[in-house]
Amino acid sequence: MADPPDRATGPTRDRIVTAAVETIKTHGLAGASARAIAKTGGFNQALIYYYFPSLTGLYLAALEHTSAARMNAYLARMTDIRSLDDLVRVGGELFDEDVAAGHITVLAELVSSALAQPEIGARITELMEPWVRLTQDTIDRFVRGTFVEPIIQTGAIAQGLVAFYLGIEMLYHLDRDRSRTDALFAMFKALAPIASPFLAASPQPGGENDD
């Protein structure tokens, strides 16, 4: 039987999810007990089990919440990206926002528990799909009309980039050392002017470049 509508949505449920995000962000998954989450949110811990079947269900709801919020933030910034330089700059800014929002911590903590709890791994995989599509759409936009468009598989590249970015996030979560990430974005910034000519649109037959 499905949960009643007031259990699926509403301000109380949102408050519980927000408290879970903040607790995981501050104390990690090991410290995100029902009591700790309730203390963070200032509510009775019995409410957690009224709205969620288990703590795992709440943890996944917390990840869904941060993932949706970050996706909206990324989509809002896509219009700012008109060149590879923009892509590197915006990418660095969004990474900083991911850290501050707690998304990286929530994701990393749940990934670490996925081997022991397959249902978590399956849901994380589902939540990664919109990020792969967003990445592929961005790549398609950059290569459209260029000589590299017919020779690359943007879907495979998108999968690889999302996995690579996830790896960067995992490393940062382990030691909080931003120097590696800074060095990586600095390298991308240096490579952008070199790569840009390869992404210039190819002359079209009948265009103004034709005699």
Describe each model-derived feature in a short phrase.
Residues A2-D6:
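Short Lys/Arg-rich basic patches
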Residues R15, A19-G57, A61:
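Helix-turn-helix
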Residues R15, A19-T26, A73, R77, ...:
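Solvent-exposed, amphipathic alpha-helical segments
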Residues P53-G57, M78-R82, V99, L115, ...:
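Residues in soluble alpha-helical coiled-coils and helical-bundle/repeat scaffolds
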Residues A61, N72-I104, T154-L161:
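Hydrophobic alpha-helical connector segments
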Residues E64-A69:
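Short, basic, alpha-helical segments at the C-terminal edge of helix-turn-helix-like DNA-binding modules
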Residues D85, E119-T125, E129, F142-D211:
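Hydrophobic/aromatic-rich alpha-helical bundle segments in the mid-to-C-terminal region
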Residues D86, V99-T125:
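Amphipathic alpha-helical segments used for helix-helix packing
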